[in-house]
Structures are given as C-alpha cells and as structure tokens.
Amino acid sequence: MELGTFIEQICRYDRQEYFECYGQIEERLHNLEKILGTLEESQRSMILEQMEHQAGEAPVWMRIHLLSFCMKVSRTPAYTQELLQTVLDADWSEVGEYEKLSDYWQIGTAVFADARLKGERTQEQLAALYRMLFDAFCGALGIRGRNYVPAEERDGNLVFVMTSQVLGQNHAPTKTLLDRCLVLKKYLGKKVVIINTAMQISGKGAGPFYDLCEAGYLPELCNLDHIEFQGEVFEFHQCANDMPNLDTMVQLVQMIRERKPCYLLDIGGSDICADICGMFVPEITVGTVFSAVAMSCGEYQLLDGKPGNGDLPVLERLGVDAEKIAAARFTFVFKPQEHHYTRQELGIWEHGFVLMIVGWRLDWEIADDFLAMLDRIAAQRENVQVVFMGRYESWQSIQTGYERLWKHTRYLGKQEDALAVFACGDLYVNPRRAGGGSSVAEALYQGLPAVTLPEGDVSAAAGEAFRVRDYEQMEREILRYMDDAGYYSRQSARARERAKELLDSRKSFGEAIGKLEEKIKDGSVALSISCFDT
C-alpha cells in the first residue's frame, strides 16, 4: 500500500477504530522510518511533506500522531514547532488535559534526547503548554491563586522535597534528589519529607504519539516509609502509578496544609502536582537540566548562573518573576568507585589516547557532523581510540560511513562503575546535546580534561576552560591534547580542581538555600543571590 493511500485509509478511522489498529499503524510507521533512512535527504523531505499535508485533513488527535512521526524522523525543529502549536491550539473537547500533558512530556523528552529538534521558539512553546496545563489542573481543583499558610504558622525546620521520579542510585536525578536532601538535613538542620509524585512522563490518558516513551517506576518503593542515604534517614512517600490523580493531589495539598513546611523544594520541574502544592507554601524549583530554567510555575528557582536572554520569554510564559531566580552552581554526587580496571580488561588500547564519549541517549545525540570530526582525527592519529560508554545501539553503523573511525572504535555499553572506566581514559569528548552533566563531572574528577561546545549541561558543568566554539575547533583541541603533554597536564589539574567545586553541595546549594530562606521569610522580591562568579 502506498503512503498516500495508507494515510487516506487511517484518516477515515474514528478514535475507536484507530486505537484498535494502533499497533499495526505504529508497525507500518516504523517500517516507513527504516525505508526513509535509506533515502537521500531530498526524497525523505518530500515524503514527510506529503505526510504533513495529508495530516492537515485529519482529526487533530490523529494529526498529532503523524506530526510526531515527522518530527522524530526528520530531526528538524520545524516539525517540533508545528507539533507544539497543534497541541496548543487543539480544543479541549478534542485533546483533553491528560492527553495534552502526555504530549507535553513526549515532545519535551524527544527534544532533550535530540538537540536537533530544538528551535528558537521550542522552549517558549513548551512553557506556554505547561502553563496552560497548570492552569487547567488548578481550575479542576478550584485553585484560583496562591494561598500560603501564614509564615508565622509554618514550621521553620520542616521541608517537603518533591520530585516526579525516584529510581536507583545509578539514576542521576535520584542522586541529585538525595544529595540535596542530605544537605538540608545534615548541614541546615531540617527535617526532610521526600515525596515521589510519579508525574514523570505521564501516560494517563495518552493519545496516539509515534514511538511513545515511558518512564521508569519502581512499585516496590510504595511499601517504604523512609529512605536511607549516607547515614541519614528521610521520611518517604511514593504516589501510585496513576498520576495525575486529582484525589491524590488533594491529599498532598491537605498534607501540606496540615504539616505546614517552611517551603517546598521541587527537584526537576515539569511537575504540575508539585506546583499545585506550591500554591500553599513557597516553592523553590531546582532543575535537573541545569543549563536552562526549569519548567515550573513555582515562585522561586535555583539556576546554574543567571537567566539568559532565551530564558526570559520562557519565564514570562510560565508566569515566573525573573527577579526570583537565584544562582547556585549545580553540584553532583557520585556512586563510589568499587573497581580498578586495567585497559586490557576493558578492551582498550594499552598505549592509545582514549577519547571517552558517554551517555544514555547516544543514538539521538550523535550526529554525522560529530562522527565526521572523529573520523578526521582517526585519519590523522593512528594511536587514537574512541570509546563509547552507555547506550548506543546503532554504533555498528559507523563502519558503513566512517571506515577510518570504525577501526578506532570500542563500545563498552552500560557500565556500573563509571569512575573506574573513566580512570582508563584520557579525554572526555561531548557531542552537541542538552544533558550529560553528571558524566563530565565524573570524568573531571578522574583528571580527564573535557572538550565541549558552549551549550547544554556539560558546558555548564565543565566551565569556560573546556569549551570550544564548534566542531572544527574541537578537532584542533583534541589534537592539541594528544600532542602537547604540558598542556594536557595543566588542563588535567584544572579538571580535578573543577571537580572539587562540582562536588561541594554544602557550599553551593547549602549557602544559596540559606540565603533564599531569608528572602522568603522577609517577603523580599528581588534576589541578588550568587554563590559563584558567573
């Protein structure tokens, strides 16, 4: 069946028929994606434009499905922005609150995984959609404005810490959560209550969306009433895996109003449940994508640096006062090193110069321009080895397009002891992407210099000393590290010093929170808080 005929056929389906055939439709789209991957760019674009045109005649919920396919396959921001606008403009009667929330998470997750999907207006559109959803859920709960528990009634020693997902200690956001709770309790003397709202990538009421992703959820945590971390014990609650649930939200609001914490700390953002609770006590949001403001309607935020020009329209859409954004360096906590590997044990060249490329979304984050740069280096230096660690399922495709690079490639897959592996490397090399901050911090700790473009979490964590302008400069910088032992030694020392700063949560987070607490107490609006030089 030709594509045009296929689209015409499914456009005649009502919702029930569409969902009955949903698995077959997804399978057909997956096969189409494989075919498109073999075509020239011009042919691929023409077919996607045909699909986009036909989608314009479909019901809006179906149009979202087809545009999501175009977005993920094209890897261009134009389809992202069209898809977001379609969701924003969709009437509530056709695409309801739960379905729009699912779309918000699916699009946001795709953009985070593949930086090529992000356009100039993408973050602003996501913020507008998030604010729309926040207002809708507030309306459903009868909340019409902030109604804080009076300051004199709030318990100055009690803090509620909310997050949308709690997994194991290999999960960087969970480590961030526990590290911040440790500082609050051990160094600031707070009693801490952790609540997993389970709002991450909500699947409740999800509509058709291509290659739908799901969040991890550990049901066994529902049986726990406390969590232990580095010798400290924290009260713990986990919501059932049916969020957003209005009854659960009401129960959490009641808990806030009864126990009256001095404030609420939201780790991660994009959590409507936390933001609703933040209508009753002050809320401070700490994003885990720390190089940009978090998607949160909470009154206050901590950001790694000052809001940039691109952040201001996002804050405006969210209804957040830019003067209430406080600066604090984002810090990390590592899983302790348990092993001491040799290069031979890892299959790494004993006398090679090892480039480490690390991440859980490398299939989306690694693009041809990055591979071409590595291929040029492989052509110039016989002793270079490129080691991929994490998840890169398509790594073997390197051999068809980059034969020189392929001969210098090693794929380690998932590693439980990242610090032990980094100890066998020489240089951390970062592709263009949003995330990766935790892995570069681990590399710096082991004395590996980094080389990164001036964008995303890796750039924010590594700092100015390790940034390059573009991939051409990255190529020259890598060669310099290989050829200039003195330069490498100096940069390695700077890497270790930077890592010390990135591990000092007590100073960075603790001092910023302490100052922010004073601002909340006296009701000040303007925040000129900075715990480092930007």
Placement of each model-derived feature along the sequence:
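N-terminal subdomain of nucleotide-sugar transferases
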Residues: 2-57, 62, 67-70, 95-219
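Active-site-proximal region of nucleotide-activated glycan assembly enzymes
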Residues: 117-128, 280-337
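Conserved catalytic-core segment of nucleotide-activated headgroup transferases in glycan assembly
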Residues: 171-183, 309, 320-405, 411
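Conserved active-site histidine-acidic residue motif and adjacent donor-binding/catalytic loop
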Residues: 242-246, 392-395, 409-422, 435-436
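Short acidic alpha-helix that forms the nucleotide-activated donor recognition element
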Residues: 250-254, 414-426, 445
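Acidic donor-binding loop of glycosyltransferase active sites
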Residues: 259-263, 423-435, 448
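Catalytic binding pocket for nucleotide-activated donors in carbohydrate/polymer assembly enzymes
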Residues: 313, 322, 431-485, 489-500
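A charged, aromatic-enriched C-terminal amphipathic alpha-helix characteristic of glycosyltransferases
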Residues: 340, 346, 483-527
